Every structure is written in structure tokens, then in C-alpha cells.
Curated annotation (Swiss-Prot):
Name the UniProt record assigns to this protein: Somatoliberin
Segments passing through the bilayer: none
Modified residues (Leucine amide): 44
InterPro entries listed in its UniProt record: Glucagon_GIP_secretin_VIP, VIP/GHRH-like
Function: GRF is released by the hypothalamus and acts on the adenohypophyse to stimulate the secretion of growth hormone.
Location(s), subcellular: Secreted
Source taxon at top rank: Eukaryota
UniProt keyword list: Amidation, Secreted
Organism: Ovis aries
Length: 44
């Protein structure tokens, strides 16, 4: 019983961590694109 609870919460935490990493990756990618756009504007 305790094992099941542990596995459940462990899976939840893992899911939250991977979701957070995914969000960070997306945010970083968007910021990178934005920086590239700004760089292009500055060059023009």
C-alpha cells in the first residue's frame, strides 16, 4: 500500500518536473527567437 502511494506521488512529481522543463524549454526558445528578431531589426 505504501509502495503504491510512493509510486503515485513519485510519478506526479516526475510529471511536474518534466512539464516544468518543457515549459522552460518553450520559453527559452521563444525568447531566443525574439532576440534573433530584434537582432535582425537592429541590423536593418
Amino acid at each position: 500500500y505504501a509502495d503504491a502511494i510512493f509510486t503515485n506521488s513519485y510519478r506526479k512529481i516526475l510529471g511536474q518536473l518534466s512539464a516544468r522543463k518543457l515549459l522552460q524549454d518553450i520559453m527559452n526558445r521563444q525568447q531566443g527567437e525574439r532576440n534573433q528578431e530584434q537582432g535582425a531589426k537592429v541590423r536593418l
